[in-house]
Amino acid sequence: MLMSSVTAHDFNSIYRQKGIITAFKEAGYRTAFFSNQRYNHSFIDFFGKEADICDFIKEDAGDGSYNPSDDELLKLVAAELAENASKQFIVLHTYGSHFNYRERYPADHAFFLPDFPVDAELKYKDNLINAYDNSIRYTDNFL
C-alpha cells in the first residue's frame, strides 16, 4: 500500500504532502500503524509516525534478537480493535518475503521442501526458491 500520492516524477513533493494516515486522521478516524520491521529512517517511518498509535515491534526487544513472524502484528490489531473506536484505520507493515526467506514463516508452514536455511549461493538455488515460495504462501495465509 502506498503511503502517499507522490510519484517518481514529483518525488520531492513528498516533503510537502500529507500521507494517507493523516488523511484518515483528518476525516475523524483513529489511526494505527504497526510494523514488523525496524526503524530505518525511511518514509515508511515518517508516514507511520503520523498515526495516533505507532509500534515497530522489532524495536520492542531492543537487542535485535527479536524476530517475530508477521502474525505477531495481529495481536496489536486485536488490541486496537478492542478500543472500539467508531472509525478506525489500521496499517500493517509486514516483513513479508524479505531475505532470509526461511525466517519469514513458522516451520509448520513449510510446504515446499527442502527449505533449510542456507546462504544466498547458486548451489542452494532450489532451497532458496522453496523457502521463498513458502514465505509467499505464508503471507497469502496471513492476508
Regions found by a protein language model. Give the residues of each.
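A long, amphipathic alpha-helix that forms part
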Residues: L74-A79, D115-L143
